[in-house]
Amino acid sequence: SCDTNLNQISPIPSVPVSYTLHILRDAPQLMTPGNSVAITEPNKQGQYIGYGGLLICYGLDDKYYAFDLSCPHEHRRDVRVEVDMIFATCPECGSQFDVGFGSGFCNKGESKYPLKRYTVTRTGDYLRVTQ
């Protein structure tokens, strides 16, 4: 039913997020709008990838977005959304989230919450994801 209440706090716990990648070297697919990359392991010591991992998207609006991979309906570290172009779908509850324009809002399924969103800063060919 997706009654997304935009004022609700995400049930995904706040844990450290600090992750940097080089677009060309680490994720060349992020040079094409509509593409994304899922990060489930830190790439080096001192990198933190949130609760269930990071979903980094290059939106159709030419901006970068990042979300926690954990489904906010299931809120379990091991239940991660799977991405197909501009939608991320939970394999457990079937909720579908819009990631193509960075909202993370649920547009189909049971989740009352959007995906937990993180901040992305681009500097040259580097992307940095923080809380």
Where do the PLM segments sit?
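Sec-dependent bacterial lipoprotein signal peptides
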Residues: S1-C2
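N-terminal pre-ligand scaffold of iron-sulfur
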Residues: N5-D84, K116-Q131
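Surface-exposed, polar helix/loop patches in the mature regions of secreted/periplasmic/lumenal proteins
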Residues: H73-G109
